[in-house]
Amino acid sequence: MSHAWLEQRERGSIFGMRLIVGAAFLVGRTMARLMLHPICLYFLLFSVKSRRASRKFLSRALGRRPHFSDLYRHYFAFATVALDRFFLLKDRYELFEVRIHGQDVLQHALDRGQGCLLLGAHLGSFEILRAAGTSYRLEVAMVMYEDNAKMVNTVANAMNPALPDRIIGLGRLDSMFKVYDRLQRNAWVGILGDRVLQGGEQLPAPFLGEAALFPTSPYRIALMLKRPILFMTGLYLGGNRYELHFEKIFDAETVPRAAREAAIERALHRYAGRLEHYCRKAPYNWFNFYDFWDAGSPAVPARANKTEGAEERSGS
């Protein structure tokens, strides 16, 4: 897995972002989506690296050479999901039609009354989980790397002051301690398992025709605290429609110590396999706009590098 995502920086300004979000709430979601078209066209034309990454991914997921319209749909899906996040942060759930698949898996995990890891990816919307949370009384603390999305986070936190309490910043000295604490208190923690900080342990797994590297830390955390892992993705289907999918991919309680490494590898491969399945099902929902298969390692802040290494060793 490439570490290039750590070098990606936001474009634009906080003022511009606040202006767009404010206008969206003024005119409503339908009109706001129309406003996204010129913005998407601009970024598609002038963001060369992102466009190249989009084309490479879509060629794998679609099984053919993507057309310009495919690239545009990819950018527009990303912009729509980003816009919808702000409506969800303001509890505007009535704007969306959400279907849930794997309700039995979700309900079984809730009935146990224990903490659980929700392992997602930059595929679709994790925020749409808030809509399901109203029915299931589900609150999830999200583990995020915040340094390359400061403007978005600033605007989001201003809209929903309770949001910072549900975010665990990745790459800090106390990151994993907070994760352990939440899980030990039987809370749910969401982690995106398709990115890793430099220095973190990774293992290869087949993904869309080529091996990619994925982090092992979620599985080590689950083993340490004997908590299950559910794969979760919230796919955007167009219009106001989303689908939430839940699948159990790892049961840490049943793994003997001597079999841990093999169990981690199997679970990681299962994660990569389910991620590939949903990428093919909804290819325009893939929001990693960099070369995912490039194993290059750009420089990473020292605190993130050291912290991730310590976190991995603590879980072995």
Segments predicted by a language model, with ranges:
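Short amphipathic alpha-helical segments and helix-helix/interface helices
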Residues: 106-107, 130, 156-157, 179-180, ...
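A conditional alpha-helix N-cap/helix-loop micro-motif detector
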Residues: 96-100, 149, 169-173, 211-212, ...
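Catalytic core of membrane glycerolipid acyltransferases/transacylases, capturing the structured
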Residues: 66-67, 80, 112-172, 185, ...
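Membrane-anchoring hydrophobic helices of lipid-metabolizing enzymes
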Residues: 1-120, 155-157, 162-164
